[in-house]
Amino acid sequence: MKAALQEFNIVIDHKSSNDIKIVPSLIPSFWDSLEPQQPGIDTSKASLALLADVEDIYLPYDVQYQLEACISQGIFNEVNITTEFLRRLANLSRGRTRRRDRAKDLLTYTLQSRVENRVESRDKLDEKRIYDPMSLFEDKTAMSHYPEISLPGHCIWVRKVVVTPTTMYLSSPAPEPSNRVLRQYTNYEDRFIRVQFTDELIKGRIYSDPDTTRDNALFNRVHRALQNGIRIGGRHFQYLATGNSQFREHGAYFFCPTDFLTCDNIRNWMGDVNHIRVVAKYASRLGQCFSTTRIPKASPIGQAIVHIDDIEHDGWCFTDGVGKIAFSRAKFLMQNLDMTRTAKTLPSAFQFRLGGSKGILVQWPDVPFNEVHLRPSQNKFNAVSKGLEIIKTSRFSIASLNRQTITILSCLGVPDEAFEEMMKKQIADYERAMTDAEFAMQLLSKYVDQNGITTIMAQMIADGFMETKEPFFMILLHIWRAWSMRLLREKARIMVDKGAFVFGCADETRTLRGHSDATDFSQSKDRNTLPQIFLQVPKTGVRTGEQGEYTVITGICVLGRNPSLHPGDIRVVEAVDVPALRHLHDVVVFPTVGDRDIPSMCSGGDLDGDDYFVIWDPRLIPTEWNHPPMKQENLKPKELDRDVKLTDLISFFVSYMKNDSLSTIAHAHLAKCDSLTDGPKDPQCIELARLHSNAVDYPKTGQKAYLEASLRPKNYPHFMEKAPSRTYRSTKILGRLYDQVAQIEFNPELDGTFDQRILRRYSLKYELLKTVRMIKRQHDKAMRQIMNQHDIETEFEAWSTFMMSKPRLGGEYKRQENMEPVMTSHRERFRDACIKLAGSRDPDALYPVVAATYRVTWEEVQIALRRVPAAVGETESRMYSMPLISFPWVFEYELGRIAMAKDKFELEEVPKPTTALLDDDYTDDDDEFKRIIGASISGSDETDDVEGLYTGQSIQATQVAEVVEEQSTTHEELVELEEDEDTGMDALAKLTD
């Protein structure tokens, strides 16, 4: 009853009687103050009515958007919003400048502070909702909300809308790595929105059975939104296109046209794809332009594009997606992109986009100085854009098994004892790593994750942070173990010490021996008949920071690509040493001769950026070496007899949502492999593997994979964690592995024991701490926004990308991969701010600022611990009331250097916390505030900027506009003043300008 009443905006008074009286309902009227009645539109019934400009109350688009976002998230109810509230917002907004709008900032704070409480229970909805919106104007914290600092050049602010069957949820603009389209139209960035279609939020992804009509209404809603567009904040957004990764998660970009720029204009600029009449391929080609990329600075000498031939034989392409790049050009890319913090050597390969071309570029010594060599298999369409864009670089990460690969290897003859032995040792290793620093460092250096976070953690141990029990590091160590154990239990993710997970590329020298069809079904174990590969990886046991030492793998290996469902998806190969290939590392090199290319045998892979696992552990070499690969089914794509229209793209989007059965088929295959005697070799499993391959290609071919009822499991093994009524206990290898692993909970706890080596290193001025504290507030807001936008519970999960919760949409691997550029950009933003504050990257200037970030974080924790005393059984609730502590660790390398420095400490003992830094009210009196503004940054010398920041006090953002308003009476004059004179309010913004 309580939840139902709250849906109707009824405040629940727990002290009142149980008598309930029925009163007349309220109809929201505030929309009429902002929107004239339009023919055919009943605004009183709109769930998120359209705000429009009228003469008496004007709210800019970004203010209207934030207001609708607050309503959509349940913070405001329409009946509580009055004309007076709107007028107050409009008055605040009239003083808007280039950098801020007080009304927008007020609503942004309201949205972030309420939504970030992560109240999931409807029973607690009253903790989230504001019944009296006018009370916001009395909230000093809300009124003094500081605008975000600026972004790195490769990021952009993006608005996101989630459309469910019953409503829409709007999110505040969040920083995201940009793509080609958003960079080209950066002046229109507020006219782009990302839209995602889901079931209700607590359910997540929309799952549908194409045989039933129960979901027709739902998919009709999706179709209407795509066809008619979405109206938000007085703007009409229309469907633009869908990025390829977005597509699988049911997302798309929408754009609000102007008189001079339409969606058709943008699609035409993206590329010439009119010759493509397969709707799926047409959509996929447009989607290339939305890949998250970074662009290097222009080379003084430019780059020369040279077109070379593919290597083909009997209809198979051995160089599908791979090109070449000169050493000098590759070095220039890395110097100008700073793509990775962990690379100690120049990457051998770059995943890229260049106009309508895609794939990877591999370093080769025969490529002249500034040339890039492209192949026909890489060119997909012609595009106006001609710049080289980089997605990611080659890097080493350790190979791991999963439920599919274990199932396949087991059916090929690998004994179950091998898997059980490996899992038992891995569990023991995780336990030992919690107390043995040297062993933990070795394990972290060996078990490198896809984002390279474990190598950073290993360096933290080398810097002594495990010995001092530094709280942030110790929590990271525990979450790494809990995350690893969860994946062990749920995914059978067993790390393989003698294994690698790397990009695939081609042998341009044609030295490696290729595959022979004559060996298919052969019982021979003659290594001279095996296809060959080349692989060079970091030496085992190399300490963190000493990368650059590599070893060439030789001997019998197993090779594959995830997911592997067919017995022939995993190949037995021979790794050999070829001197002409030794310049390549952290990539697996495939032969370019033979009857068929190896990548296509591995779950239909190619060389345009696919990752392959290579394992040379003798225990995992199967007894069956030559199982034939799955026969490729040449599905003929659906081709139109006319040009593709926008309506075709929309229909295909909805059709894909309704018929996407990829995960359903994968689960059916896993269950059937466990229940059937022959496992993956059973005809039913072979058919499911074929269907899965077709489902993977559905976004490219437009041909859906239909799962017949006879192939659907009636019951599931217990390790799949399905409903108890449809579960049986599995006695096969996956069931036994599942039972070995205990569930480990992650409960972070702060005890306040920070590293004294950093706290005592420098004597820090109060003014510096004050300014750094201001930057930390911005960091924490940005971190919370990332956590909220990506459904992440703690900052430790976000920082490490070791997420403990399952994603509502998409897979866990892809989610972790997508978080890497988000967190890299986040770190860069706040590193840049602190470096600008220091005035230099020189350690003498920068390290005191880094130490200040650690000091203010420590002080917040100390004071919070006093305010929130520990109570038995309240560890979790206490943790969530503590301040965020990840801010200093945007400088994890520099913190290590400070901690390990041999210099004398400037402080004899740990300083006492400065409680003034944590006052909730940052307001100075008017005289002091005007003095700060009067001492604002002037001149062009960077040192002057820094001095101004060191001597400034904490600045209340709302006061700035008030002071400016006293000096100017018109909006035009305000803009003029903003451009001509920097005020104290802009001190933080200048840090990243």
Language model features: what each stretch is:
Residues M1-G604, D611, I615-D993:
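Beta-strand-enriched accessory nucleic-acid recognition/scaffold domains that flank the catalytic cores
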